[in-house]
């Protein structure tokens, strides 16, 4: 089939590479426009755009897929199907109607669970043991189109959102190619999603990532891993923001009776009390500084056991 791939961030590259290496003819790539990045706010091309250029594939960067000029360009390419991974813009019906077999999205959950922008983060945050990736035909309703295929992936106890997303992208690459193959030879038909089990995964905002130390340790662990690497879990210390890397559980004996948000500062580690048992901080990043081990941070800041941080969204 003639295919036009749509995607923008790094996570889409494994699928782009798999499609490019498949028997299908990759005639173009669609991605978001160059965007300012870094301290100098220089315009940079998306990771997908850069990879497409390495592959020698033409790149389209419409300001919005509703633009008539873009739709004419797409129509001229005569695509049979448009595989999509994290493109980052809503597709109007006029664009959806152009490819013969529509637009096929790879979504990083086992639909109908976790429809929306942040399925991996929400699966970890909810404490799910298993998640997956699904290929489905895009329709107007959010992530509600009929599905072609699904893969499952166990969520490991130490998985961050970044870890899990990387595995799903690698596994999903094979799923996407198999889906395109099945569409081409007629062996695969899209099936409506189940009406039961629908859940939603809206974007996780920075404020959502603030840790409430009065919550149980297991909930805080899930939250921190779900928000790693982005937007990054955080708390406050003396009014300054402190970003948190993944935490580990301290046993009940090691909790030292610490109250929520109360520090237990040792020579080699730093504990924080929660609504249940304490957690042990891993790496942290103070405001305006580089990431460091929690013990080094506490030593440099001259923090002692009993200091309270970010308690119930306000310090005391």
From Swiss-Prot:
Reaction catalyzed: L-methionyl-tRNA(fMet) + (6R)-10-formyltetrahydrofolate = N-formyl-L-methionyl-tRNA(fMet) + (6S)-5,6,7,8-tetrahydrofolate + H(+)
Gene3D superfamilies tied to this protein: 3.40.50.12230
Keyword vocabulary terms for this entry: Protein biosynthesis, Transferase
EC number: 2.1.2.9
GO cellular component terms, A-Z: cytosol
Domain of life: Bacteria
InterPro entries (UniProt xref): Fmt (IPR005794), Formyl_trans_C (IPR005793), Formyl_transf_N (IPR002376), Formyl_transf_N_sf (IPR036477), Formyl_transferase-like_C_sf (IPR011034), Met-tRNA-FMT_C (IPR044135), Met-tRNA-FMT_N (IPR041711)
Record flagged with keyword Kinase: no
GO molecular function terms listed in the Swiss-Prot or TrEMBL record: methionyl-tRNA formyltransferase activity
Binding sites annotated in the UniProt record for (6S)-5,6,7,8-tetrahydrofolate: 109-112
Similarity annotation: Belongs to the Fmt family.
Job description of the protein: Attaches a formyl group to the free amino group of methionyl-tRNA(fMet). The formyl group appears to play a dual role in the initiator identity of N-formylmethionyl-tRNA by promoting its recognition by IF2 and preventing the misappropriation of this tRNA by the elongation apparatus.
NCBIfam families per UniProt: fmt
Name under which the protein is recorded: Methionyl-tRNA formyltransferase
The species this protein was found in: Nocardioides sp. (strain ATCC BAA-499 / JS614)
Gene name tied to this protein: fmt
